[in-house]
């Protein structure tokens, strides 16, 4: 049912040690053969590459997995469920503008009923047919409603509220990024690996652990925010329902 990968660090790093095994989960070592995508940021600008072909067979993905160096990235391998066919417009990650920033989103799970929810305006209109992209647009609409002064506690609390509402419709693990902060929500299946050594401070997020090491599962319904490889906020899980700014 799709898999997620996210990365945040305090300096540019080559991501091959994680992206290479993640690529194999795109139809090779896991049943996610219906497309892949990688978003990364360079000098504040998002670059997005994706294809509807199986990731483990893709030469383009092999090059990206080997060569990509960045401080911030989101990747996805897809198992087509809703709609149950591959296609470029339905391949994650998705990118839309909100609050004068470009946001990138990828999702693991199924929340098909979200497609029927009414939207409040044209802020974000899906390009494809997936429940994932519809959910993304609803999240961005909520963020915009609380983003007037760009105070993180306000829009993050609104994001958490909408996340919990959408999660009642099914399974809703996701990664979201505005080019500065990596937001990860573990509804029921997400892991993190946090590292701080001579090579820098970094966090790797993945649906399943990709390497040996002290990977830790997210608590159920836990939302975390990372910046420069450091966790700066946490909601849900075993914490209070209001933002815990670290």
Listing of model-derived features with the role each one plays in the protein:
Residues 72, 148-187:
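Catalytic core of PPM/PP2C metal-dependent serine/threonine phosphatase domains
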Residues 15, 48, 83-85, 113-116, ...:
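Short helix/loop capping segments that flank catalytic or ligand/cofactor-binding pockets
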Residues 1-57, 184, 189, 203, ...:
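Extreme N-terminus nucleophile/cap motif
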């Amino acid at each position: 049912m799709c898999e997620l990968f996210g990365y945040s660090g305090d300096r540019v790093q080559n991501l091959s040690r994680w992206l290479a095994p993640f690529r194999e989960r795109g139809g090779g070592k896991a049943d996610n053969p219906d497309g892949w995508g990688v978003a990364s940021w360079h000098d504040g600008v998002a670059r997005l590459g994706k294809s509807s072909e199986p990731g483990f067979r893709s030469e383009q993905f092999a090059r990206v997995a080997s060569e990509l160096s960045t401080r911030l990235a989101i990747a996805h391998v897809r198992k087509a469920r809703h709609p149950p066919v591959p296609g470029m417009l339905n391949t994650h990650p998705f990118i839309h503008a909100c609050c004068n920033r470009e946001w990138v989103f990828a999702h693991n799970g199924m929340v098909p009923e979200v497609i029927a929810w009414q939207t409040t305006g044209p802020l974000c209109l899906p390009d494809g047919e997936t429940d994932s992209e519809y959910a993304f647009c609803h999240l961005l609409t909520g963020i915009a409603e609380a983003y007037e002064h760009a105070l993180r506690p306000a829009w993050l609390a609104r994001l958490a509220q909408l996340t919990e509402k959408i999660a009642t419709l099914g399974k809703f693990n996701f990664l979201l990024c505005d080019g500065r902060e990596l937001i990860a929500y573990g509804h029921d299946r997400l892991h993190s690996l946090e590292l701080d050594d001579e090579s820098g401070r970094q966090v790797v997020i993945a649906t399943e652990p990709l390497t040996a090491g002290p990977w830790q599962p997210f608590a159920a319904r836990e939302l975390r925010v990372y910046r420069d490889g450091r966790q700066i906020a946490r909601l849900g899980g075993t914490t209070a329902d209001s933002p815990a700014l670290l």
